[in-house]
UniProtKB/Swiss-Prot annotation:
Protein name: Pyrimidine-nucleoside phosphorylase
SMART domains documented for this protein: PYNP_C
Subunit structure as annotated in this protein's UniProt entry: Homodimer.
Cofactor annotation: K(+)
Amino acid sequence: MRMIDIIEKKRDGHTLTTEEINFFIDGYVKGDIPDYQASSLAMAIYFQDMNDDERAALTMAMVNSGDMIDLSDIKGVKVDKHSTGGVGDTTTLVLAPLVAAVDVPVAKMSGRGLGHTGGTIDKLEAIDGFHVEIDEATFVKLVNENKVAVVGQSGNLTPADKKLYALRDVTGTVNSIPLIASSIMSKKIAAGADAIVLDVKTGSGAFMKTLEDAEALAHAMVRIGNNVGRNTMAIISDMNQPLGRAIGNALELQEAIDTLKGQGPKDLTELVLTLGSQMVVLANKAETLEEARALLIEAINSGAALEKFKTFIKNQGGDETVIDHPERLPQAQYQIEYKAKKSGYVTELVSNDIGVASMMLGAGRLTKEDDIDLAVGIVLNKKIGDKVEEGESLLTIHSNRQDVDDVVKKLDSSITIADHVVSPTLIHKIIIE
């Protein structure tokens, strides 16, 4: 088999066999196939696309290029959730203890965040003493006993994806549905998931700006999952404004605690219940999405979800008293109100810009080596559709420096107030095939 033949075959719009895809991935990981040939094939895929069989084969070739996490010692169906990323996305912190409270095992591998705020692990490390460096045996034991544990990413998972992702980044082949879908799904499958729930974001603060693109990606990932024996569902949710009200690590953790108490923002609560219902159904703990939702609402109302979060924190060395004493979380030195310059209705909150503003305060990382300030960030006091009076606070800046002129300047261009009401949509579609 020759790589040049595979490139030409895809260039001319033909279907690659599983053997050809395996030959490419194996050779590329070993270093036998050079970057220039790999980038040539990536560009051919970009223009000619791949069918469902090719996408599934590419995904599994990437899964098989490295280690796979074995979660077979954990009882029950392990359901993993993946979000394509957004601003203020606190869902994992709420979902993990919530679905665990209705007997769904959550064995979560998480990374540290690059971008606007930290990842799930950074947020959890805002809790004094919380640690994620636990060995596999302890991880399995904690999930079996309490249904939920979070561990830092380890092992050599999907090396082919890491290599191909870096190549796509510099060759103009990032925005390709088969390449994005196989990249995301290979990581989830390698991490040991039996079933997968996907939250595909669309809008100004999302990777997929249009609903059409988000739908294409969601269908692609659901089909890959189902084709390789992992029950998969997706929802398409809106990221034209940040989710919830908090953007920042300790601030988002506080918001997660409020949501588990039943006092969280409406949009975050609704998204969590929608995603959680799918997880409960896929884990065979309810027959319908309606039944699953009722179980989750009961877990919040009874306090079971909050109790589960407390035990989870305690199990991993954290100070669980932060649940009842949120003032023990890292606090920023200064709270600065950003006020409306005129009266009207909020019609636009540019997610990315607000995320960048939060990053400028120190809430996120530009490189893996950067330190994060867990206390800082932004809390939205108004969201799209809300009425606002001139001089009223639109948001609160939590900062450890007094001079935030650069942040204010960024925010000036990210908020629009007009004299008409806009009603945002939170959940656009649910995709099951």
